[in-house]
Amino acid sequence: MSDPLALAQALLRCPSVTPLDAGAQSVLAEALTAQGFTVTQLPFGDIANFYAKRVGPRSGPHLCFAGHTDVVPPGDAPWSVDAFAGEVHDGVLIGRGACDMKGAIASFVAACAARPDHPGTISLLITGDEEGVATDGTVRVLDWMRQAGEIPDFCVVGEPTNPGRLGEVIKIGRRGSLNATLTVRGRQGHVAYPHRADNPLPRLVAALHALTTTRLDDGMEGFEPSSLQLTTVDVGNPATNVIPEQAQARLNIRFNPLHRGDDLARWLRGIVQDHAPDAVIDIAISGEAFVTDPDRDPRPGASHGIAALRMAIQRITGLSPRLDTGGGTSDARFITHLCPVVEFGLVGATMHQRDEAVAVRDLQDLTGIYEALLDFYLGKDSA
């Protein structure tokens, strides 16, 4: 087995806080080029991206690994070590991006190094725009891949899917996400003279009550019920004797595949306009719900890929991973439109936290899992 630690440390030492790359992708591209990968740089705007590909000596499927080299800021809370030093203490690698997700990238590259004569094709889709607005990253690379005819049979995204132990969870889908801002305007005035003012709050409150008391669905197999949550309600008015001129609320809907984002947007607009006809409604759909169901997805790569990954996890960890759809959004929501996709990476207990960390043993075991996945999926062993 190849050791991923040195590459993981080199990546952590690049302070690649979105949208900065800070040399991270150069480190990665150099490692892949040395293994015989062809690396195509695909910068869009200020974002660094690349697509790397290696074709084996024998025919076989095309397996893609997708990952991001950008990280969130280290935050204001003091770390026990430098967040970008890549230090190992007591068998634990500490640094921003250790589990989300530079460690997983290093493990996959190490797995590729251990399988230089694999059948089929291995590719990597690497972006620097996953933690940001995600407009010049994976979505743009996917457009390029379609035009270039680079269509994988199966893709694994190296997100930290495991809550506490490596091998617990494969993510086979995600809920969709809709954000909305509702603004209701009125006329400011003194509370003692309400007839001279127009209070926007009753209209906004009525709309919010109607939204939050509606049950969107009862859930479906593999997915919890869709959820609408208020995140802010604000009038910008500290005074107790002034009727505000404006009231604003923000909300998020996490929805399962029973809904499409556009349908929920129309529903939301209708409810709000029933109670606040003058409301200004801004809606952004950051991703649709999706699922790569091994029993129902008609694409042949789906069932074979999930079976191969489950066998690889069982071989290295002895665990039988559960298939799950919980959590937030990831770039898998874009990749699903190109090919079957799942997510599997490290333990995510410390992602986005102070002293983000990963056990060195987990890095090594994840490398072993990815090696076994290459064997099972590409044809060295049968899944």
Curated annotation (Swiss-Prot):
One of its GO terms (biological process) is lysine biosynthetic process via diaminopimelate. Pathway: Amino-acid biosynthesis; L-lysine biosynthesis via DAP pathway; LL-2,6-diaminopimelate from (S)-tetrahydrodipicolinate (succinylase route): step 3/3. Binds 2 Zn(2+) or Co(2+) ions per subunit. Pfam families: M20_dimer, Peptidase_M20. InterPro entries: Bact_exopeptidase_dim_dom (IPR036264), DapE_proteobac (IPR005941), Peptidase_M20 (IPR002933), Peptidase_M20_dimer (IPR011650), Peptidase_M20A (IPR050072). GO terms for molecular function: acetylornithine deacetylase activity; cobalt ion binding; succinyl-diaminopimelate desuccinylase activity; zinc ion binding. The active site is at D70, E130. HAMAP family: DapE (MF_01690). Homodimer. This is Succinyl-diaminopimelate desuccinylase. It comes from Granulibacter bethesdensis (strain ATCC BAA-1260 / CGDNIH1). The lineage of its organism: Bacteria, Pseudomonadati, Pseudomonadota, Alphaproteobacteria, Acetobacterales. The gene is dapE.
